């Protein structure tokens, strides 16, 4: 699944990839980039049938029951096939259904337990005999059917269930998605089963290892479109203007990948692939699916070739769903998307949106093999799905669109997202033990998406991309239609490469965090490298520093990059192969760690960057490492400022993006400091970018490359945000023309920045104008940009209006609540207002976004992590100490870590930052 994290650090990303993972221009604080489980966050998980050693016999019925470490179903039966018929009833937002599940009986038993949530069972039969002993466990989300007679071992049992449920508005299970058409609210019925919401749609064995076949039928009004995972088998007319559409039986798949949709839909098709490709959307928007359909055709061909396995399903439908919590969902053969991540006017979209849509489509299609065809055994293997799909989307994009140079962006995007979150004490290993269903959504974060993909990139660099992809192909062929553990992938890569991948990667996947590698120059052409755990707060305890990672040092010298040297102990001495005093650790930034040099080496590397001795990835990594080391206290922030000041002539967009992000993180940390320091930092920012901004300007032409467009838009956004008079004046003038009817006055690449700037300086009239754009947009992209800008207003009475909209789901969709919150986080008044809103409306928020869904943790993080002071942190702790933290406890812990890190940073460096700005004459 693609995360709903919409940060546009580079436009090609991640939150993410349930984060991926969307639409933000810049998060001022780098720390928060990781915390929108992208959706950016994604969904996927529960638990699997345990090993025999983890079972015990219950004395009353002899059925194998899993120990309570993990909430999974008994293994006395195994589902083989579901024959499911379901009908949505839009008049009262309910649905009714019936199913017959074929089970293989593994042992003599007199009961079957299934997952069920908010489902009313009206009737049940086992092998045609009525079942009346039916009990529910709301806490475990199960229903148990107890029979008069035992089922015999080895037999096939048929359990018939007739049921009803709510066509809910929670964007989970079988739910209703609303949209406007001709001023009227209309609905479609759609599904989101991942991670554990198939149980909301029909009673099921809702665990990823319980793969079954499904024959699905939908009953609906004749004029509505019905879709499911497989192609249509037959349609039968029913009384009352109804029809029953039955679909072909699916191949083996997990319940979280089941999908069905009923609605008034139109489609555009692409015939450039061997199976039909269609993009569905609400009437009048279908033409906006052409770009994604073309991307899909190219991508499926590419993956067929790379994996050596043809796309495994009989069609590909991609559907834009108007109410959708994640970025996208990889249901077999029926992929669902947020509208903004599928539909695009390619001729009028900004470059970051185009890149985002491309990445999301590629990510979901990679899942059709990696996740759907071959599926994780249980949910602590989530990263297998998400990390690989993220890596594969970058790999495919680099192959199909080499001019985009996405691996350069990767270092500033996925890698930094991963390192940022994993530097928190409240992070988690790539492989996470999951006990309860309400814990699952919390691990749809940058660790699953970005650290997972970063680890795979590191392996691919070590083994070579061709060998890596060959190993993956072998893995898919060996395990197709089955389930796997992480070790299965490592073994396949070991066999393909001859390297001991299992030994190396077990350490990376099963331990929290990553190291900082300190480089000491000891003379005689030798350096000593030492690894310790890195924390954003800079206060690692001895007990937290036990893991020794296999660190691929990637020693770069004038002779190239030596990939053979690995640091597996605490320290190691290395003889440099050259005597010209040029070296850098982590060449091309392939490794997952930070590097700390002696002060003189930072200066020399800064000079090497200017002289062209460092690759784009090296330069990005150097800035990122300096920024992270400054915020955590390993170096002074003035050293970071010295480095970026020396690179004012930098020409690469990705490097500039990292520079501006790091300055943004300083600004966020200083948010509650004195105005003089903040004003001086703005003056420095304007001076830093002035020469390059004058060179590039912000006019766009048909001759501009992808990178040219990104650089112009990024520099303009930073100039306007730093109150550059010329940029601000242009933003105001362009907006006035736009409001007056000149729709060409705002270039798509500048739209978000211009909206934000006008909001920042705007009044009630400006708010009304942006609100009108939001309610009557010309594109989804324009709608999102207007919504995000709401948070940029600074007048208290307008901020009251903005926060007043957050819980009005008829105006701001539940899925979009975080978008104006991102804007509010950009300034001091907004951060304070956001906390006031969160604390005063908590009970209502908790009802709207219950902990079992993925968005509550994101809202908690957004509403709290903008703070920078210990007294503010204490206020947050005291508030949540009185609340039930279930379902968002990890997000809260991470947010508190973020506040601590910023508090320590400002206590340590605020004075020296001002002194540096003063010494460089930025305080006038």
Curated annotation (Swiss-Prot):
Residues modified to N-acetylserine: 58
Gene3D superfamilies on file: 1.25.50.20, 2.60.40.1910, Neutral Protease Domain 2 (1.10.390.10), tricorn interacting facor f3 domain (2.60.40.1730)
Signal peptide: 1-45
Enzyme Commission identifier(s): 3.4.11.-
Thermal dependence: Optimum temperature is 30 degrees Celsius.
Keywords tagged on the record: Acetylation, Aminopeptidase, Cell wall, Glycoprotein, Hydrolase, Metal-binding, Metalloprotease, Protease, Secreted, Signal, Zinc
Cofactor: Zn(2+)
GO cellular component: cytoplasm; extracellular region; extracellular space; fungal-type cell wall; fungal-type vacuole lumen; membrane; multivesicular body; NVT complex
Enzyme class: hydrolase
Site (Transition state stabilizer): 449
Biophysicochemical property: pH dependence: Optimum pH is 7.2.
Hydrolase keyword on record: yes
Details of cofactor binding: Binds 1 zinc ion per subunit.
Chain sites annotated for binding Zn(2+): 363, 367, 386
CDD domains: M1_APN-Q_like (cd09601)
GO MF terms, alphabetically ordered: metalloaminopeptidase activity; peptide binding; serine-type peptidase activity; zinc ion binding
Family: Belongs to the peptidase M1 family.
Name listed for the protein in its UniProt record: Aminopeptidase 2
Natural source organism: Candida albicans (strain SC5314 / ATCC MYA-2876) (Yeast)
Organism classification: Eukaryota, Fungi, Dikarya, Ascomycota, Saccharomycotina
Gene of this entry: APE2
């Amino acid at each position: 699944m693609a995360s709903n994290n919409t940060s546009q650090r580079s436009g090609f990303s991640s939150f993410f990839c349930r984060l991926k993972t969307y639409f933000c221009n810049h998060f001022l604080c780098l720390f928060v980039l990781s915390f929108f489980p992208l959706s950016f966050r994604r969904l996927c998980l529960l638990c699997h049938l345990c090993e025999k050693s983890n079972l015990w016999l219950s004395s009353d019925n002899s059925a194998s029951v899993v120990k309570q470490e993990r909430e999974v179903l008994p293994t006395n039966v195994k589902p083989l096939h579901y024959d499911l018929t379901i009908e949505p009833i839009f008049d009262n937002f309910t649905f009714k259904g019936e199913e017959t599940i074929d089970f293989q009986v593994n042992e003599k038993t007199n009961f079957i337990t299934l997952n069920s949530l908010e489902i009313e069972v009206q009737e049940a039969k086992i092998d045609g005999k009525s079942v009346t002993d039916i009990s529910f466990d709301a806490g475990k989300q199960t229903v148990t059917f107890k029979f008069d007679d035992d089922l015999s071992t080895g037999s096939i049992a048929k359990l018939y269930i007739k049921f009803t449920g709510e066509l809910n508005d929670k964007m989970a299970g079988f739910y209703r998605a609303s949209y406007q058409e001709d001023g009227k609210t209309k609905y479609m019925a759609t599904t989101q089963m991942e991670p554990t919401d198939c149980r909301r749609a029909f009673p099921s064995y809702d665990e990823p290892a319980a793969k079954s076949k499904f024959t699905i039928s939908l009953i609906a009004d004749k004029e509505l479109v019905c879709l499911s995972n497989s192609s249509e088998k037959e349609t039968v007319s029913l009384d009352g203007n109804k029809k029953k559409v039955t679909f072909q039986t699916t191949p083996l798949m997990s319940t979280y990948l089941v999908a069905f949709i009923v609605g008034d839909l139109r489609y555009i098709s692409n015939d450039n692939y061997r199976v039909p490709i269609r993009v569905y959307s609400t009437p009048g928007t279908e033409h906006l699916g052409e770009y994604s359909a073309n991307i899909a055709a190219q991508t499926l061909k590419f993956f067929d070739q790379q994996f050596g396995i043809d796309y495994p399903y009989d069609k590909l439908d991609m559907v834009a769903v108007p109410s959708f919590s994640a970025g996208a969902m990889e249901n077999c053969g029926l992929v669902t998307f947020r509208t903004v991540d599928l539909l695009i006017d390619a001729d009028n979209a900004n470059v970051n949106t185009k890149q985002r849509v491309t990445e999301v489509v590629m990510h979901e299609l990679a899942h059709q093999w990696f996740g759907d065809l071959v599926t994780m055994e249980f949910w602590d293997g989530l990263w297998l799905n998400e990390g690989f799909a993220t890596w594969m989307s970058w790999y495919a994009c680099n192959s199909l669109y080499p001019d985009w140079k996405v691996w350069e962006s990767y270092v500033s995007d996925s890698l930094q997202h991963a390192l940022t979150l994993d530097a928190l004490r409240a992070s988690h290993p790539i492989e996470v033990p999951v006990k309860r269903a309400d814990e699952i959504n919390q691990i749809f974060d940058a660790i699953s998406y970005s650290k997972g993909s970063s680890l795979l990139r590191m392996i691919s660099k070590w083994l070579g991309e061709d060998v890596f992809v060959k190993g993956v192909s072998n893995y898919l062929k060996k395990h197709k239609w089955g389930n796997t553990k992480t070790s299965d992938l490592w073994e396949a890569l070991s066999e393909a490469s001859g390297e001991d991948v299992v030994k190396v990667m077990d350490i990376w996947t099963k331990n929290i965090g990553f190291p900082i590698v300190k480089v000491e120059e000891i003379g005689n052409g030798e350096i000593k490298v030492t690894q310790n755990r890195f924390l954003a707060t800079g206060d690692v305890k001895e007990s937290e520093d036990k893991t020794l990672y296999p660190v691929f040092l990637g020693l770069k010298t004038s002779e190239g990059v030596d990939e053979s040297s690995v640091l597996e102990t605490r320290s190691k001495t290395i003889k440099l192969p050259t005597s010209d005093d040029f070296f850098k650790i982590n060449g091309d930034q392939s490794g997952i760690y930070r590097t700390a040099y002696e002060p003189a080496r930072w200066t020399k590397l800064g000079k090497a960057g200017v002289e062209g001795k460092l690759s784009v990835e090296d330069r990005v990594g150097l800035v990122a490492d300096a920024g992270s080391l400054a915020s955590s206290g390993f170096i002074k922030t003035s050293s970071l400022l010295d480095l970026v000041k020396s690179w004012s002539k930098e020409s690469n967009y990705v490097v500039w993006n990292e520079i501006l992000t790091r300055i943004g993180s300083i600004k966020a940390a200083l948010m509650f400091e004195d105005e003089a320091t903040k004003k001086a930092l703005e003056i420095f920012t304007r001076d830093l970018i002035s020469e390059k901004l004058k060179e590039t300007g912000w006019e766009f032409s048909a001759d501009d490359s992808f990178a040219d467009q990104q650089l112009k838009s990024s520099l303009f956004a930073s100039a306007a945000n730093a109150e550059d008079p010329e940029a601000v004046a242009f933003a105001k003038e362009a907006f006035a023309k736009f409001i007056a009817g000149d729709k060409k006055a705002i270039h798509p690449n500048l739209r978000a920045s211009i909206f934000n700037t006008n909001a920042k300086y705007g009044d009630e009239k400006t708010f009304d104008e942006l609100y009108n754009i939001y309610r009557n947009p010309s594109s989804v992209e324009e709608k999102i940009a207007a919504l995000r800008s709401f948070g940029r207003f600074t007048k208290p009475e307008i901020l009251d209006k903005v926060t007043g909209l957050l819980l009005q789901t008829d105006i701001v969709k539940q899925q979009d609540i975080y978008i104006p919150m991102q804007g509010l986080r950009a300034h001091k008044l907004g951060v304070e207002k956001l906390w006031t809103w969160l604390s005063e409306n908590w009970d209502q928020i908790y009802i709207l976004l219950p902990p079992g869904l993925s968005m509550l943790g994101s809202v908690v993080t957004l509403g709290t992590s903008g703070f920078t002071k210990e007294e503010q942190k204490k206020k947050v702790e005291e508030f949540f100490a009185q609340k039930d933290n279930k379902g968002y406890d990890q997000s809260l812990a991470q947010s508190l870590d973020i506040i601590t890190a910023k508090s320590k940073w400002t206590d340590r460096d605020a004075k020296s930052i001002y002194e540096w700005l003063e010494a460089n004459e930025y305080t006038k």
